[in-house]
């Protein structure tokens, strides 16, 4: 078993993490600055076949995260397709789609704070949420071992067009029921949420 095999019920039964739905994202998010490069990339993405998870990752999700990075250079590092093995006895092992970690000069994760899981389908499903929750719990263990505990670990599950946000705080997984929508003409709602969460993570 690995992160991507977790079910929602496993978070409670195997990791003792209750799962709740509650509004926790700020509803008055600051607008994300216009990113001309992202808009150019999305214009080209319109012409591509986007029927697979890999295509959506390459043409939409990755460019969105790169835009976030451009606005916050030096504040975090993006790890993509990273093998994050923490505790195989609890199935806390496997590859993560994206990890946002504290900045590092090398290629080793220092203090992971944010996980992004891409759905296999065109919408957000419970399996992707469970995978994200397990990865967040693993990050909590990792940070505690490193002597860098964080008040909260954050996560996001995305189909590329819909972005759902999750947090792990006080041993509770909380899913915000309000998803952020991305369109080719307006990719900024999820970026505004990502920026707000990044600011919260940096303040941890």
Predicted regions and their residues:
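A short, conserved, highly charged catalytic patch centered on acidic carboxylates
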Residues: 2-4, 11-23, 27-151, 167-204
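Short, conserved secondary-structure transition motifs
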Residues: 157-164
């Amino acid at each position: 078993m690995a992160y991507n095999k977790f079910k929602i019920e496993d978070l409670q039964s195997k990791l003792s993490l209750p799962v709740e739905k509650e509004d926790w994202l700020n509803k008055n998010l600051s607008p994300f600055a216009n990113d001309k490069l992202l808009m150019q990339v999305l214009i080209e993405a319109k012409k591509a076949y986007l029927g697979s998870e890999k295509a959506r990752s390459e043409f939409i999700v990755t460019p969105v995260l790169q835009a976030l990075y451009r606005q916050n250079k030096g504040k975090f590092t993006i790890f993509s397709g990273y093998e994050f093995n923490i505790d195989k006895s609890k199935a806390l092992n496997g590859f993560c789609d994206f990890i946002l970690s504290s900045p590092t000069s090398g290629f080793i994760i220092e203090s992971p704070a944010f996980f992004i899981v891409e759905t296999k389908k065109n919408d957000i499903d419970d399996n992707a949420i469970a995978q994200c929750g397990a990865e967040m719990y693993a990050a909590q263990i990792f940070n505690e071992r490193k002597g860098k505990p964080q008040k909260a670990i954050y996560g996001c599950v995305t189909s590329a067009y819909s972005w759902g946000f999750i947090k792990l705080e006080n041993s509770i997984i909380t899913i915000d029921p309000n998803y952020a929508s991305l369109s080719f003409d307006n990719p900024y709602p999820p970026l505004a949420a990502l920026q707000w969460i990044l600011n919260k993570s940096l303040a941890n």
